């Protein structure tokens, strides 16, 4: 496996025209690192149509209602099995998925999600929520740092969700899909790491995991920095690939340039008060 440094970023953002009335689709059949990147970039584009940018980073919507609150993503594995995953457009959370004539909703999915998504088929409420702590517990008390990622693991996750195998396989599948779809949409580094593992597997490194944990704080401080000449009100602690602490203190950091989506925060002009307009991150 080729090692990628923590500060590796993809400088080039390629936007693609995405029709607003269709799902985003990704099939592993014939997939390459390039087609995976195109899928992730199309998803980012769809999630941020008409939204502002802060330091040239697209900001997610601060609110949405009804079906507009959710983006559907259809994933197909190497065996041709497909599931359709529903993402919350405000924070890129996975809230539910459909396999055949059954839709499965995470325990913390909203009533609105249950009311508007996957109408006309059987709905099942899962006994665990969509945050990492709950999923890791349901997956057999395994930390996501010990769960391998890569195209083969995405394929297996889709298959387990499609068949909804009992036990720990589905919550483990959620952990794989969340990191390779939602987290990859948020961070170019995560997108890059996944795209490199078409025929191989890898376990998330400390940098990979610390970015996931700090997305909310990074989004907050980047938006506060607009009122502070680019400086953060509080440093954000991350980890390098070798697990050394490192701190991000302003928008000139290469870490900031590697962020692809920001969670929306409303900043009180003239103060450092910030009001989160969505749920906390995974």
Curated annotation (Swiss-Prot):
Reaction equation(s) it catalyzes: Endohydrolysis of the N-glycosidic bond at one specific adenosine on the 28S rRNA
**Signal peptide boundaries:** 1-21
Catalytic residues of the enzyme: 183
Biological process (GO) annotations?
Answer: defense response; negative regulation of translation
Q: Which UniProt keywords apply?
A: Glycoprotein, Hydrolase, Plant defense, Protein synthesis inhibitor, Signal, Toxin
Q: What is its EC number?
A: 3.2.2.22
Q: Which PROSITE patterns match?
A: SHIGA_RICIN (PS00275)
Pfam families found in the cross-reference section: RIP
Instruction: Write one Gene Ontology MF term.
Output: toxin activity
Positions glycosylated per UniProt = 25
Asked if Secreted is a keyword of the record, the answer is no
Q: Which family does it belong to?
A: Belongs to the ribosome-inactivating protein family. Type 1 RIP subfamily.
Function, as annotated: Ribosome-inactivating protein of type 1, inhibits protein synthesis in animal cells.
UniProt name for this protein: Ribosome-inactivating protein bryodin II
Species, as recorded: Bryonia dioica
């Amino acid at each position: 496996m080729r090692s990628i440094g923590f500060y590796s970023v993809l400088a080039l953002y390629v936007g693609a025209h995405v029709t607003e009335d269709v799902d985003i689709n990704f099939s592993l059949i014939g997939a390459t690192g390039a087609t995976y990147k195109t899928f992730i970039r199309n998803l980012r584009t769809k999630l941020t149509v008409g939204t502002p940018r802060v330091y040239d980073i697209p900001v997610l919507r601060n609110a949405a209602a009804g079906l507009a609150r959710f983006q559907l993503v259809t994933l197909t594995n190497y065996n041709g099995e497909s599931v359709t995953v529903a993402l919350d457009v405000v924070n890129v959370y996975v809230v539910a998925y459909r396999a055949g004539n059954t839709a499965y909703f995470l325990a913390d999915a909203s009533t609105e999600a249950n009311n508007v998504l996957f109408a006309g088929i059987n709905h099942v409420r899962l006994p665990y929520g969509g945050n990492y702590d709950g999923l890791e517990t349901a997956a057999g008390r395994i930390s996501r740092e010990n769960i391998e990622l890569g195209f083969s693991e995405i394929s297996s996750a889709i298959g387990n969700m499609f068949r909804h195998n009992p036990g720990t396989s589905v919550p483990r599948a959620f952990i794989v899909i969340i990191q390779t779809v939602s987290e990859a949409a948020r961070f170019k580094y995560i997108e890059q790491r996944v795209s490199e593992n078409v025929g191989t597997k890898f376990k998330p490194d400390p940098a990979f995991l610390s970015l996931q944990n700090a997305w909310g704080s990074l989004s907050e401080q980047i938006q506060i920095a607009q009122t502070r000449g680019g400086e953060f009100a509080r440093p954000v602690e991350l980890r390098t690939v070798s697990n050394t602490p490192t701190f991000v203190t302003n928008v000139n950091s290469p870490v900031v340039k590697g962020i692809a989506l920001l969670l929306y925060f409303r900043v009180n002009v003239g103060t450092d008060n910030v009001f989160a307009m969505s749920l906390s991150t995974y």
